[in-house]
From Swiss-Prot:
<feature type="binding site">
    <location>
        <position position="141"/>
    </location>
    <ligand>
        <name>Zn(2+)</name>
    </ligand>
</feature>
<dbReference type="InterPro" id="IPR036793">
    <property type="entry name" value="Asp_carbatrfase_reg_N_sf"/>
</dbReference>
<protein>
    <recommendedName>
        <fullName>Aspartate carbamoyltransferase regulatory chain</fullName>
    </recommendedName>
</protein>
<dbReference type="InterPro" id="IPR020545">
    <property type="entry name" value="Asp_carbamoyltransf_reg_N"/>
</dbReference>
<keyword id="KW-0479">Metal-binding</keyword>
<keyword id="KW-0665">Pyrimidine biosynthesis</keyword>
<dbReference type="GO" id="GO:0006221">
    <property type="term" value="P:pyrimidine nucleotide biosynthetic process"/>
</dbReference>
<feature type="binding site">
    <location>
        <position position="114"/>
    </location>
    <ligand>
        <name>Zn(2+)</name>
    </ligand>
</feature>
<dbReference type="GO" id="GO:0009347">
    <property type="term" value="C:aspartate carbamoyltransferase complex"/>
</dbReference>
<dbReference type="InterPro" id="IPR036792">
    <property type="entry name" value="Asp_carbatrfase_reg_C_sf"/>
</dbReference>
<feature type="binding site">
    <location>
        <position position="138"/>
    </location>
    <ligand>
        <name>Zn(2+)</name>
    </ligand>
</feature>
<dbReference type="InterPro" id="IPR020542">
    <property type="entry name" value="Asp_carbamoyltrfase_reg_C"/>
</dbReference>
<dbReference type="GO" id="GO:0046872">
    <property type="term" value="F:metal ion binding"/>
</dbReference>
<dbReference type="InterPro" id="IPR002801">
    <property type="entry name" value="Asp_carbamoylTrfase_reg"/>
</dbReference>
<comment type="similarity">
    <text>Belongs to the PyrI family.</text>
</comment>
<keyword id="KW-0862">Zinc</keyword>
<comment type="subunit">
    <text>Contains catalytic and regulatory chains.</text>
</comment>
Amino acid sequence: MTQDYKLQVEAIKCGTVIDHIPAQIGFKLLSLFKLTATDQRITIGLNLPSKRSGRKDLIKIENTFLTEQQANQLAMYAPDATVNRIDNYEVVKKLTLSLPERIDAVLTCPNSNCISHNEPVDSSFTVKAQRGEISLKCKYCEKEFDHLTVLHAD
């Protein structure tokens, strides 16, 4: 018995594939982590079928490779995501994501009185994980927020 399978999102020859992003989070990751700040082709799949979770998002960035630090920052919002390095249409490296200790110059502090809104400083958060809950503590105002609150703080 043979079956024909068709990729729903075109394969890339060289670059990074971020797979198993929770549905509805892909666009936010593109924006937060400035993944579109490139002139390389980016392919996005939204609400794709997933055996693991029902639905998922997918991002493919040609000729661009995420560092381990960049990939780990994604873990906060896509903890089960996989980040694959592709060379000549083959996966040559899989990055295992883990929460970073800090996230700098990516997120916005939800505290409207925080100096990071009015001063020329990059945001900086300490990442804390306790009992499966992730929170972020702002370096400047020292307030602690649930990671989803910070995700929606734009």
